[in-house]
């Protein structure tokens, strides 16, 4: 939109990013931080500064390529749906533009065991985009790679959890928005292309650690007492199977990452014990995608 403003948040970069921006794009507003606060706290600090100026904030990763007019359908959807807190575009892979991209595809969901999946992506299988998800849809979570959110809701729901540092923090925020009564949506009339893996490669043990630890923290925070313990017990069993697989393939670094994730979850979960516990289980009754994917061979969302 013509009234929009491009703001670059420099999260403690150590290259010549700031110099390049000042020289090549002097009209862009720059918000530099002296250190890398991570994906979560970097956005929190920026939005706390910018929220009074803007009704909507767009969280856009630096590895996302956009097309002219991509933002217009997202803003229009929020304007027309005041009960919706945040929206995402259709995310396609920047390296294989005929296919959906891992980190959001056409909108995210969470299965009964806490595993995130998407319209267009189950586990690591990304579907080709054949227009099968070209209608707007309510979703459980929207991708943080290109998230348009009401700044007031972002702040009232607590923003991204800085203890996550990176990975899955937008899913946690979306879960809290849903618990607060807000809707979330995927708006496929808007299309962007995401490179992905810009922070950490897929098989990096640090990524494995953050994904496993943060998923456990997210479940601990957002599930009611009535189902939290049983869900976490199932996850401990399933994560043990994943650990065994890494051991069997001699991938000891990723096996150690899972062990550290559970160790640190046990240490960190008490930080959330004083928060108000949810009373609604938003993933109860959702599909079991492990069963659907591995035993029944269902590799696509619509199957």
List the predicted regions and their residue ranges.
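A conserved acidic beta->alpha catalytic loop
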Residues: 10-19, 35
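Short beta-strand-to-loop acidic/aromatic patch adjacent to the donor-nucleotide binding site
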Residues: 53-65
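A short, conserved alpha-helix in the catalytic core of glycosyltransferases
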Residues: 134-191
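Conserved donor NDP-sugar-binding/catalytic core segment of glycosyltransferases
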Residues: 65-115
């Amino acid at each position: 939109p013509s009234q929009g403003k491009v703001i670059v948040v420099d999260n403690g970069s150590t290259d010549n990013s700031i110099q390049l921006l000042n020289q090549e794009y002097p009209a862009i507003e720059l918000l530099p931080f002296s250190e890398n606060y991570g994906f979560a706290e970097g956005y929190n600090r920026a939005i706390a500064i910018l929220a009074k100026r803007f009704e909507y904030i767009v969280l856009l990763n630096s590895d996302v390529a956009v097309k002219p007019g991509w933002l217009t359908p997202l803003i229009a959807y929020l304007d027309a749906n005041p009960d919706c807190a945040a929206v995402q575009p259709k995310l396609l892979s920047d390296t294989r533009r005929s296919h959906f991209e891992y980190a959001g595809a056409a909108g995210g969901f969470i299965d009964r065991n806490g595993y995130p999946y998407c319209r267009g992506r189950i586990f690591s299988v990304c579907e080709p985009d054949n227009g099968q998800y070209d209608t707007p849809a309510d979703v459980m979570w929207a991708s943080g790679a290109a998230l348009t959110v009401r700044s007031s809701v972002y702040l009232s729901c607590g923003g991204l959890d800085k203890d996550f540092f990176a990975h899955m923090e937008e899913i946690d925020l979306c879960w809290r928005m849903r618990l607060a009564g807000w809707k979330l949506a995927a708006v496929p009339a808007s299309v962007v292309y995401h490179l992905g893996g810009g922070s950490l490669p897929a098989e990096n043990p640090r990524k494995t650690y953050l994904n496993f630890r943060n998923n456990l923290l997210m479940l601990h925070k957002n599930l009611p007492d009535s189902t939290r313990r049983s869900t976490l017990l199932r996850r401990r069993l399933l994560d043990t199977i994943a650990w065994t697989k890494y051991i069997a393939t001699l991938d000891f670094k990723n096996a150690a990452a899972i062990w550290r994730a559970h160790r640190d979850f046990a240490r960190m979960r008490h930080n959330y014990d004083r928060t108000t516990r949810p009373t609604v289980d938003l993933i109860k009754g959702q599909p079991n995608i492990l069963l659907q994917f591995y035993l029944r061979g269902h590799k696509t969302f619509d199957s």
